[in-house]
């Protein structure tokens, strides 16, 4: 186990631009080893082109993470299996494969379910409810979170108010299932840290 001093030396070496090639491959690419310097996960988006063109099957994601990269934690993209969540059979197969490989499912990245900060009350409610199935799927797969977008329209303060409303309602549903709701700081005002902090307040 590294001491605090060892950790600071390694961090300083990396931060100062010293080559990290001396670090083992498992330190960089993830490992189940308790001695690894870093623990990382593989985002399914890394394979989205291969999956979309049929080169890689979504169900092979956990196997690829473990066998090709020695990574034992993964993050799913809802778009890559959105048409298969109608029943529990597919999710059960996903879970069985990940469990069999010793891979932990961490979260589901969610897009194309509507704007959680939509100015229209009905559309905003629909967007919130569209995310429920992903909270349910995340719970079933053993994830700790889903990642969402805080998309909205209008003036700065109005978007903050609308996004806060949608996220608050979705967070309430997530809390009932012990699933966190994480906002991606990507696109629109969600890239503004001050704005996003205001949404959370």
Functional labels for PLM-detected ranges:
Residues 73-74, 164-201:
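Acidic/histidine-rich catalytic cores of soluble enzymes
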Residues 79-80, 111-113, 145, 152-153, ...:
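Conserved beta-strand edge residues that scaffold enzyme active sites
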